Regions:
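Catalytic-pocket segment enriched in acidic/His residues
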Residues: 60-195
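Short Gly/aromatic-enriched secondary-structure transition segments
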Residues: 41-52
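Short helix/loop capping segments that flank catalytic or ligand/cofactor-binding pockets
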Residues: 9, 39-41, 61-63
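Extended, compositionally biased flexible segments
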Residues: 1-17
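A generic local secondary-structure boundary/capping motif
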Residues: 13-22, 28, 36-43, 72-77, ...
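Conserved hydrophobic/aromatic beta-strand scaffold that supports enzyme active sites
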Residues: 5, 29-31, 84-88
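Residues embedded in well-ordered beta-strands
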Residues: 27-31, 52, 104
């Protein structure tokens, strides 16, 4: 994501008229606390200042545009306002285990995503090891760690299993209210507006 997409934890999220497939993704966000390069997973925790929530808003049709056989991850995720984060940074000393936190997302009070950060494909420390193997991470850099099943683009519901009630994809519309919460961190809430 581009830094210009960062939004406050209660800011409105713009749904451009150019997208029909605006999606939500609750994610644990890591905030880097000191410069690191080629850091092992075993030492990665020493470089995390703290944790936040990120709603990794995505325009799925933009991601698939011109690339039907793969997903484009930059412009489809970097529109202005599409990176609400917060509600504050909880320091790493305050989170005993970042891989044991409940994580949920609601759209209009309907539970859409529900999981635990222990279900991540790559844990926080492995992600820092991988990223720092190729680039220097600087204080203030934010790493979003991936989302659980149940996004609007996913055929699976909050349980992670096929949702028989769900008829296809479910995307965001103006007026929708998206609430993302992570245990021990807090809650962010964003209203979708047409822009």
């Amino acid at each position: 994501k581009q830094v210009s997409c960062i939004n406050d934890p209660y800011g409105d999220v713009i749904k451009p008229e150019s997208t029909m497939m605006l999606d939500y993704e609750v994610e644990l966000a890591l905030v880097i606390g000191k410069t690191c390069y080629q850091v092992s997973a075993e030492e990665a925790s020493n470089y995390i200042f703290g944790y936040m929530i990120c709603n990794d808003i995505s325009m799925r049709d933009w991601q698939l545009h011109n690339m039907p056989d793969r997903v484009e991850l930059m412009i489809g995720k970097s529109h202005d306002s599409h990176g609400p984060t917060g509600p504050w940074i909880v320091t790493s000393e305050e989170i005993a285990d970042p891989h044991n936190l409940k994580i949920n997302c609601y759209v209009n009070n309907e539970l859409r995503q529900s999981s635990d950060t222990g279900d991540m494909i790559w844990d926080c420390f492995e992600q820092i090891e991988y990223l720092s193997s190729a680039m220097t991470l600087k204080p203030g850099d934010i790493i979003t760690t991936g989302t659980p099943p149940g996004s609007g683009f996913s055929p699976r519901g909050a349980s992670g299993k096929a949702d028989k009630e769900r008829k296809g994809n479910v995307f965001l519309e103006p007026g929708d209210l998206v609430k993302c919460e992570i245990e021990s961190i807090g809650t962010i809430v964003n209203k979708i507006i047409l822009g």
